[in-house]
Amino acid sequence: MEAKNNRILKDKTFDKSRWIQMPRDVIAGHDALLQLPNVITDLGVTGPLLLLSGKTTLQTVGLEVLRLLEDRQVTSAVVGEITYEEIARVEDLAQNIGAVLIIAVGGGRVIDTAKVVSYNLDIQFISVPTAASHDGIASSRASIMTADGNVSVAAHPPLAIVADTGIIAGAPHRLMAAGYADMVANYTAVMDWDLSKSKTGEQVSEYAMTLSMITAELMVENAEKIKAFDENAAWIVVKALFASGVAMSIAGSSRPASGGEHKFAHMLERLVPGKVLHGEACGVGTIISMIMHEGDWKKIRNSLRLIGAPTTPKDLGISDEIVIEAILRAKEIRPERYTIFDEDITREQAECLVARLYEE
């Protein structure tokens, strides 16, 4: 018998492969920002650095970063709304100074800008979140504003994360509550992924699904602690945001943390731009999705109420009609991603879903 016929694994019996990119260093906790110089040294980075931040943050945390890195060549820049034009401007700046590393100090807008620029120029970046408002601090996806609304694009995950819980706890409580809601959304994101598996045959990652679900469960179990909005609360939420980002890296997509509730949220943000925080919209979308999945939606609703997150259109400061429209049009967002919002939902059903949000 020829040797080739003695192979234990025959040709094409297994053809799966995946390149998983995750942060190399994660520093989180009290005074974590002071470790930033050590993190950069540990990464072996030498050369010009580009510090990106928001206008206000640059004058506070940004100045502290510049002080900590005073022995390095650092250029700072304020970033605006994350648009393709703004990304191009930052890319030009990074290339002009020969940046070898980007340090993103701020919220989701700043970090997403760094992600995309990092990806396009093939240089790494460090995420230094100043708020825990959504899981973008650790993920490999970014949201870009366009004339037709936000679009999600592939990007680099951070090479390192430096999350100072003192700084994060000092942010407005509304931001941490939004981050909590974004994590609770993992419940229905996983349900939708499983639904798509049965409806369309989509491949799933059991590891990513499990990690994502555990993250959501830990949020609900710790809601009483998180509602204090202190450093311990920031510690719990930041770890969950990081775990959710890891789940997405394992999956190679945002699937384990983004289902129909996110499609609903993106449509809501398109209908009333600037009116609601992303995490807040996801929280309401999660309740609606859980009702459709016939799950324990009141458990989700009650946990969101406990930490002061919106649970109704009235809480969001928008009309019921807008939410009804967002339910009906959610399937326009990423139509290739099947979720329960892609089922045939009538206007009457959408109206009933919104009415149930006000139930006790």
UniProtKB/Swiss-Prot annotation:
Compartment(s): Cytoplasm
EC number annotated for this UniProt entry:
1.1.1.261
Cofactor: record remark: Binds 1 zinc ion per subunit.
Task: Note whether Lyase occurs among the keywords.
Answer: no
> So where does Zn(2+) get bound?
D182, H262, H278
Q: Which GO terms describe its cellular component?
A: cytoplasm
A GO biological-process term: phospholipid biosynthetic process
Q: Which family does it belong to?
A: Belongs to the glycerol-1-phosphate dehydrogenase family.
Sum up the protein's function in the record's words.
Answer: Catalyzes the NAD(P)H-dependent reduction of dihydroxyacetonephosphate (DHAP or glycerone phosphate) to glycerol 1-phosphate (G1P). The G1P thus generated is used as the glycerophosphate backbone of phospholipids in the cellular membranes of Archaea.
The protein, known as: Glycerol-1-phosphate dehydrogenase [NAD(P)+]
